């Protein structure tokens, strides 16, 4: 003991071990007709008990204890202690009663799964299809009524009728009335004027609104037909031209002379002297 009268940690009473032999406080279960299972599967049930009914203790048991030393110098020491023998108790109980292990029911493993594996996320294509299906279910589309088409025979008949009507209807000639010397004259009925610069009369081309253009002469050359233009592909050199106002003056001059307008007018001596318009195409 210490100076204060307390027991030390290393104090050992051999008599204390013998006191456990009398009463261990074990409550053994009565034998019941149950399926007895060994404590360790795959081995003998009486593993702890040998063939002679005695308990096989370990070869060497070590107890860690503190040895009473001065307060200034304490160290950790190991002392071998003989373990109490329970051979008498186990031999008595092994003959009459066997230790029964209560079989506990297997708990549901789902309770212990704290972090279950989450299901795979749905693909974007599947979600898009689901959305389309939901939209189609929510708002059903009403089928549009198909337009009735006419049969081919009726269409052909109607097209032929339209074409015949278009062919029958002729465009009405526009009347161009000019007041010449106080007399209204329709120049649209006059014959096409000609030009005799090459020695033979050649009809002129219409130019502008009521004007005319020569097809055989320019200020430099007089030939029929006029040569092709080098600047404009597929067009000829433009001949001399006369506007509607200039042609009206020619008609006034000829009417004073008493010219008969039933004959074609020769424009050889009535062309302008300022040249030609090269951008006019002769066809």
UniProtKB/Swiss-Prot annotation:
One of its GO terms (molecular function) is sequence-specific double-stranded DNA binding. InterPro entries: GAGA-bd_tscrpt_act. GO terms for cellular component: nucleus. The keyword Transcription applies. GO terms for biological process: positive regulation of response to salt stress; regulation of developmental process; regulation of plant-type cell wall organization or biogenesis; response to ethylene. Expressed in seedlings, leaves and pistils. Detected in the base of flowers and tips of carpels, in leaf and sepal vasculature, in young rosette, in the lateral and tip of primary roots, and in the whole ovule. Residues 158-169 have a biased composition (Low complexity). Transmembrane segments: none annotated. This is Protein BASIC PENTACYSTEINE1. It comes from Arabidopsis thaliana (Mouse-ear cress).
